[in-house]
Design a protein with these regions (language model features):
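Surface-exposed beta-strand-to-loop junctions
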Residues: 1-5, 25, 64-67, 84-94, ...
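Cys/His-rich, Zn2+-coordinating zinc-finger modules
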Residues: 3-15, 44-125
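Short cysteine-rich clusters marking metal-coordination/redox-active sites
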Residues: 23-26, 43
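Canonical RING-type zinc finger of E3 ubiquitin-protein ligases
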Residues: 29-38
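Eukaryotic cytoplasmic intrinsically disordered
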Residues: 99-125, 205-241
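Disordered regulatory linkers adjacent to lipid/PI-binding modules
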Residues: 125-127, 226-278, 288, 296-297, ...
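Polybasic phosphoinositide-binding surfaces of eukaryotic membrane-targeting domains
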Residues: 128-171, 217, 246-299, 345
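Canonical pleckstrin homology
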Residues: 139-145, 178-228, 262-269, 304-363
Length: 368
């Protein structure tokens, strides 16, 4: 048997081992590439970033490239578990570890942080001060604003000018969330920050031209949230806190809605369903700064349910596929443009309704 064939078989056996069967960087199954300088098995997507890190990483295809005996022996001695012990030794509990379907900037900066910058050997500070491009509250334009995030008082401040002494806004991290939204923001490093102000959800849309900077901001928010929640929810453990640091919405998209009397004309609105706080928010457009309204979603035992609404000629509705969400106070009728969207929304509502309530949910006035 030729050494090329023999080495390919050895590599294919190595990649079947449990610790190597998923990409070392994003967890994608069945990695087809490997870094012969780091000794890790990675997927095609992550191999692209490794290919840019020529000082620390070199990649080959497991199946298509020729592997010399010494490189195969290096892969045998190392592997994903050995690399993880070295390069992820001190990853902070709050730090977001990107998964297969996360946006490019998160995966790219995670790989660079691990191998090129080797960041995870010291303690992260709970402070961040810098400039971000921020969308105006009632304008489409983005303008530079100075932001300061502090763990000392658990706040995020932003200033109109870099030398301003008085903050335009002081935002508590208590109900803050941050999520990457490159498509919505229109920039590959786009970040959406949400928080509560006067019982309404406020959106901030920001970005930074540098991918490392925006990922640092994202993880700084997670760091300060982590410190806050450890204090507020003591003695909760990390496994309970991690899902609360930052969360993606369960589903977003347009539906049409009518008013409480159900004879008002239907209007198209942008809806956001959040499973952690069990809320359905709606906005006029995806980039609105403030919600138009919100509905808390309890369990079936509290009188909440969702069902398909028969197709009918609804007053002012251009769309045909309806669904009804029943609550103790009123029924909400929504119309979807496509049948697939209707099914997806019903499935998402059912998922939230089926989740057990947590102690913090009982403070909602709808359940008292």
């Amino acid at each position: 048997m030729a050494s090329w064939d023999r080495n390919t078989i050895i590599l294919l056996d190595l990649v079947k081992q449990p610790e190597n069967a998923r990409c070392a960087d994003c967890g994608a199954p069945d990695p087809d590439w490997a870094s012969y300088k780091l000794g890790v098995f990675v997927c095609l997507n992550c191999s692209g970033t490794h290919r840019d890190l020529t000082d620390v990483s070199r990649v080959k295809s497991i199946r298509l490239d020729n592997w010399e005996d010494d490189l195969v022996e290096f892969m045998r001695r190392n592997g994903n578990a050995v690399a993880k012990a070295q390069y992820e030794k001190s990853v902070p509990a709050f730090y977001y570890r990107p998964q297969q379907h996360d946006c490019v900037v998160l995966r790219d900066q995670w790989i660079r942080a691990k191998y090129a910058r080797q960041e995870f050997t010291g303690k992260n500070a709970g402070f961040c001060d810098g400039t971000l491009w921020k969308k105006g509250k009632n304008k489409r334009q983005f303008q530079k604003r100075r932001f300061v995030l502090s763990q000392d008082d658990f706040t995020l401040r932003y200033f109109i000018k870099e030398d301003s002494k008085v903050a335009k806004a002081i935002i508590s991290v208590r109900n803050m969330n941050a999520v990457f939204q490159p498509e919505k923001v229109g920039h590959q490093n786009g970040l959406q920050i949400t928080y509560m102000t006067e019982d309404r959800t406020r959106n901030l849309f920001v970005y930074h031209e540098n991918g490392q900077e925006i990922v640092n901001w994202f993880n700084a928010v997670r760091a300060v949230r982590y410190a806050y929640l450890r204090k507020a929810l003591a003695p909760a453990n990390d496994s309970e806190l991690m899902p609360l640091l930052t969360t993606r919405s369960l589903k977003e998209g347009y539906m049409e809605k009518t008013g409480p009397m159900q004879w008002e004309p239907f209007k198209r609105r942008w809806f956001v369903l959040c499973s952690v706080d069990r809320k359905l928010l709606y906005f006029k457009t995806p980039m609105d700064a403030l919600e138009l309204g919100a509905v808390f979603i309890g369990t079936e035992a509290h009188g909440f349910s969702v069902r398909e609404t028969p197709t009918r000629g609804s007053r002012g509705s251009r769309w045909r596929y309806g669904l009804t969400m029943e609550t103790p106070d009123r029924n909400f009728i929504f119309m979807c443009e496509q049948e697939l969207e209707q099914r997806d929304w019903i499935k998402a509502f059912q998922q939230v309704i089926a989740q057990p309530l947590l102690p913090q949910h009982y403070s909602n006035k709808k359940l008292i």
